[in-house]
Amino acid sequence: MLAGCYPRPGDLLTRVLATGTFDILHPGHVYFLTQARALGDELFVIIARDSNVTHKPKPIVPEEQRLEMVNALGTVDKALLGSEKDMFEPLKEIRPDIIVLGYDQHFDIELLEEELTKRGLPAKVVRVPLSKECPLCSTGAIIKAVLKRYG
């Protein structure tokens, strides 16, 4: 069912979509994806392309490797690389019912829902609050710890 163009006609499953860079996979990512999965029956994940990451330092882990890691998680039905040109392009194929944002993804939910509706993609957008706390629950914290130890 997850091959090709991700069929939707007549299906009663709730399809959830999460997006992110997922550089240096950590428990915060796992928490986010587990919370996203709990909102529906299928979880698709779009991995940010290396070339599109402009709001923070470029990923350390190459996009193909990040894709492989996320696809290996049991909570994820299908992970795929995003479009380098149009962030809405893969959504046209996936046609999610719910789009889940992380606490650190700086999208305005109302504006995003408006843009989705304009494109014939009336998905509900929700944000997962930060709830997983651990010393190394962010890529930045992991990098700082490595530099401190081996710097």
From Swiss-Prot:
Enzyme Commission no: 2.7.7.2
MF terms in GO: ATP binding; FMN adenylyltransferase activity
Cofactor(s) essential for the protein: a divalent metal cation
InterPro entries linked to this entry: Archaeal_FAD_synthase, Cyt_trans-like, FAD_synth_RibL, Rossmann-like_a/b/a_fold
Keywords: ATP-binding, FAD, Flavoprotein, FMN, Nucleotide-binding, Nucleotidyltransferase, Transferase
Reactions this protein catalyses: FMN + ATP + H(+) = FAD + diphosphate
Enzyme type, top EC level: transferase
Record has Flavoprotein as a keyword: yes
GO biological processes: FAD biosynthetic process; FMN metabolic process
Residues annotated for ATP binding in this entry: T21, F22, H26, P27, G28, H29, D104
Pathway connected to this protein: Cofactor biosynthesis; FAD biosynthesis; FAD from FMN: step 1/1
Assembly with partners or alone: Homodimer.
Task of the protein: Catalyzes the transfer of the AMP portion of ATP to flavin mononucleotide (FMN) to produce flavin adenine dinucleotide (FAD) coenzyme.
HAMAP family recorded: FAD_synth_arch (MF_02115)
Family in the record: Belongs to the archaeal FAD synthase family.
PANTHER family according to UniProt: FAD SYNTHASE (PTHR43793:SF1)
Name assigned to this protein: FAD synthase
Originating organism: Methanosarcina acetivorans (strain ATCC 35395 / DSM 2834 / JCM 12185 / C2A)
